[in-house]
Amino acid sequence: MPIEKRRWIPTALLSSVERLVKIRSVSREKDWKIRISSSLRVSLKIMTSFKWRGSFSWSQRLATCGDRSIDGDFENVDDYSLYEGMKQIAKTGKVLAIHAENAAVTDRLGEIAKANGETTLAAYVDSRPVFTEVEAIQRAILFSKETGCPIHICHVACKEGVDAVVKAQEEGINVTCETCVHYLYFTKDELDAIGPVVKCSPPIREQAQKDALWQRVEDGKVAFVTSDHSPCTPDLKDTDNAFDAWGGISGVQNDVDVMFDEAMQKRGMALKDFAKLIAINPADRYNLTQKGRISIGKDADFVLIKPNAPYTLTADDLEYQNKISPYIGREIGAQVVQTILRGQTIYSQADGVTADFPGQFIK
């Protein structure tokens, strides 16, 4: 979720957002959106002023993605603010995207683990048990039912979370969910061998959870699969204590090739279903009317993938400013060879990322 350069938005002034739009519009290759996570009331005012097309986003959890206190990072939202915000958002018809974890429990469990001298990623996972994720999802669903606010549960890491969403859908509640590539790729038992670079929140769980998530993805119960790209500078991952490391994964560059390999090449997923997971469903849910489909009148956005072309990811392959990724050293069975945005090539294997084609701000 966080942006890579930590350009925090002073949400007290709408002009700050307008200024950021101008800055980013001349410096980014891809189309992009803003996530505002400060004062609830001010965030709503800014988004309404911009006639926001997509979604609102708040976090039902910690002020950071780990136990490290980082000035300016995302803040937790209390229940009343969430409830009031959802009542206001319901009037707009927009979707509220929620990071769902029970911070009251995970904070305390993390403190106890640290006090007991725990330092491993396995212990970090244990400090964020499944029920803390599920309880927050169920609470968000209840608030959605009471307020009529459409919601989307971000980065679900457990089968119980998906099942709660499916049950709510059957009751007529407007809720969807996603999972992430890393929850479908890694497992808890390999985390400590990889190191803090693979720490995230909610955490990567056991093999049984991974298998169950895959089943729900294949059954169409998960709306889309994302990267939850959450980069940081290397120093925030450079620690022997997992509880002190930044809790986020840099994954957006390998979201498509890893998922293509795992879903289509290894599990036989149909191309049309793959396209729904990574393009069609996200565009539909967030009302990105020009995106998600190859169709006359829509933006000509394409990604060209070379199948059955394994390669081993290295740090030199990464286009990130901070070249860290849990996928480094992994063999990926497909390659993204070209990316086209509105009919123009913005990336190719031969030339890398273009330097002269700015993206656009999508309101």
Describe each region flagged by the PLM.
Residues 1-105, 109:
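Divalent-metal coordination cores built from histidine and acidic residues
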Residues 119-150, 197, 218-219, 223-225, ...:
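His/Asp/Glu-enriched, well-ordered alpha-helical/loop segment
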Residues 106, 162, 185, 233-235, ...:
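Glycine/Thr-rich phosphate-binding loops of Rossmann-like dinucleotide-binding domains
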Residues 50, 108-109, 187-190, 236-238, ...:
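Short, well-ordered secondary-structure micro-motifs
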Residues 241, 296-362:
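C-terminal cap of metal-dependent C-N hydrolases
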Residues 102, 158, 181, 231, ...:
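Short, glycine/acidic-enriched loop or turn micro-motifs at the edges of active sites
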Residues 56-59, 148, 219, 333:
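Alpha-helix termination/capping residues and helix-transition junctions
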Residues 63-225:
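Histidine/acidic residue-rich metal-binding segments in metalloenzymes
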